[in-house]
Structure formats: C-alpha cells, structure tokens
Curated annotation (Swiss-Prot):
Region (Disordered): 223-245, 271-307
Record InterPro entries: CCDC24
GO biological process: one example: blastocyst hatching
Stretches with biased composition (Polar residues): 296-307
Name the record gives this protein: Coiled-coil domain-containing protein 24
Keyword vocabulary terms for this entry: Coiled coil
Coiled-coil parts of chain: 168-225
Record Pfam families: CCDC24 (PF15669)
Species of the source: Homo sapiens (Human)
Record keyword tRNA processing present: no
Length: 307
C-alpha cells in the first residue's frame, strides 16, 4: 500500500494557529476543503474494501500441515515466474510443432494449476504503481510549496498565498478523483472474478512453480526429433557410422562374385596345396590378371574336400 500522504488542509493546520484555522479555511474555500477531505476518506474506504476482498480470496484454505502452503510467492516474484513460464510454454508448443506432434498435447503433462497461473491475465494487484505514476513518482508538490510559504500561513498574510493554495487544493481534488476511479475499477474486477469454493486451491505454491519450471526447461533442453534436424546434420552421423561397414572395392582381376566368398571358418577346406598353402585367406585373393581366373583354386579344391 502507498503511504498515507497528508492532505493539503492537514499541512495547513500544522502551520496555522488553532484560533485562525476557521478564517483561513473560509478564505481558501470551505467547499473545496471539505471536498478534498471527503475524497480522501473515500480513497481510504476503497483501499480497505479492496484489501479485504483480496484477503478473503487468498489461498488460506490449504492445510497448515502442508509446508509448501507457507511458501506463497510475493507479487513481484509471481509476475516474474508468470513471464518465464509463458516463455517456456511457448517454446514447448513450438517444439511440438517442429516435431510434428499435436501442439495441444505439449502441455498435458504439467500441473493444471501451474498452467492456469501462467496463462491467466495478471489481475490488478493493489494499484500502487499506477497511482504512483499518476502522482508523478515523487513527494507531493503541495508539501514542497508549503515548506516555502509556511511563514505566510496566518490570517495577516494568507491573502498573499491564497490563490496559490486554492490551485494546490484543486489539483489535489483532481488527483483523488482519478485515484478513486482506479480503485473502483480494481474492486469491480475483484468481485467479477469467478469465485468457486476451490478457487483458493488453484493458486500454486512457490515450490510447485519452481518444480514445474525446471521440468519445462529440461524438456526443452532434451534432444529434438528428426524432423527438427537439418538434412546435413542427419547425413553426417550416417556416413561416419557406415564408413567401416562399406564393402571393399573389387580387386584387380577378381570376379565380382568373389566379394561374397564364405567366411574364413571354411579355410581348411579351401586351402590349396604346395607353396601357396602357407598364404592366408586374404592374401590368396591378391592375384594379378595374368594368373587367370580366381575361381580355379576353388574348383580344384572342391572335389578334394571329401578325401
């Protein structure tokens, strides 16, 4: 809540002797002074009603035994978390679209209370900021001016500053009227807000907000699907993983069918006799084109297998 700033007439009363206040009030304008006091009383009443309406809808129905119910986030932290959660939810929806999934299913695994908190429009919390900006963001100009003219605040010299004080009084009334409109709007929005017996339980705790925020960040940091990867990125691991499995080029003078020769366990049956018997299986394929077809040793060795 904004600090209660004294009214212009209250400041005048601090400098005017008691026996002269009635005459000073008549010179300034009794109607204007009474109007400013009535408007200030109305502002105080609306602030009290708004605070009472908000406290009645506060999430106080949670069990006290729940430690997380005592960790309700402050208003400024709530607004910051709401903005961060909205950005994360937008990122999750974009990721679902990129992966070809239904974007309506991108948020189903998260708490409905957190989703409601992140997607709802922030209500008009106590309108200090709006009223503070309306007042100019600083101390009352009337207070500064009165500190300068305090020596003239008496019956003898009041005529010298009466016009200036009437202008300050009129400005104060206009400011109070605008403040009343702001408070009435916030109070109306508060009572028009849907109120259910379980509405207090819809407000998530600070621990729940942080937990869901962390889960969203982890899902966004997870590897994306193949549809979100560029073709160059997909082909790079494919080539590197199959490079060692690529069949060797055909040797010079060897028929293409010999690329499908049986595995080395059949080597004892196909090993030729003589000096070439000391050669290994792979070296036997390295023959020159002048040595004739490579299928000759196989055809000569095949009938020797039964012997």
């Amino acid at each position: 809540m904004l600090r209660h700033s004294p009214s212009l007439w209250e400041l005048v009363e601090e400098h005017v002797p008691l026996r002269e206040r009635r005459e000073v009030k008549r010179i300034l304008g009794e109607a204007a002074v009474d109007l400013s006091l009535e408007l200030r009383a109305e502002v105080a009443m609306l602030r009290a009603l708004l605070q009472e309406a908000r406290s009645s809808q506060a999430p106080s129905s949670r069990p006290i035994s729940d430690p997380s119910s005592l960790l309700a986030p402050p208003p400024l932290l709530k607004d910051l978390l709401r903005q961060e959660l909205r950005q994360l939810l937008q990122g999750l929806r974009h990721k679902a679209i990129c992966e070809g999934r239904d974007q309506a299913q991108a948020w189903v695994q998260y708490s409905p209370r957190v989703l409601h908190f992140a997607l709802e429009e922030p209500r008009c919390d106590l309108p200090e900021q709006e009223i503070f900006q309306m007042r100019g963001g600083g101390p009352s100009s009337g207070h500064r001016d009165l500190s300068i003219i305090k020596d003239q605040l008496n019956v003898s010299n009041i005529d010298q500053v009466a016009r200036h004080l009437r202008g300050l009084l009129e400005e104060e009334c206009h400011t109070l009227e605008r403040e009343i409109l702001i408070l009435q709007r916030c109070l109306e929005e508060e009572y028009l807000r849907p109120c259910h017996p379980s509405e207090a339980a819809l407000e998530p705790t600070l621990a729940e907000l942080k937990e869901q925020k962390k889960a969203m960040e982890q899902e966004l940091q997870a590897s994306v699907g193949p549809s979100c990867v560029s073709p160059n990125h997909r082909q790079r691991p494919l080539g590197s993983s199959t490079q060692g499995l690529r069949p060797p080029l055909p040797l010079c003078g060897v028929a293409p069918l010999q690329c499908c020769l049986p595995a080395p366990p059949l080597e004892p049956y196909l090993r030729p006799r003589g000096q070439s018997a000391t050669h290994r299986w792979g070296r036997q394929l390295q023959c020159s084109p002048r040595e004739g077809p490579a299928s000759t040793p196989m055809s000569s060795a095949a009938p020797q297998a039964p012997a």
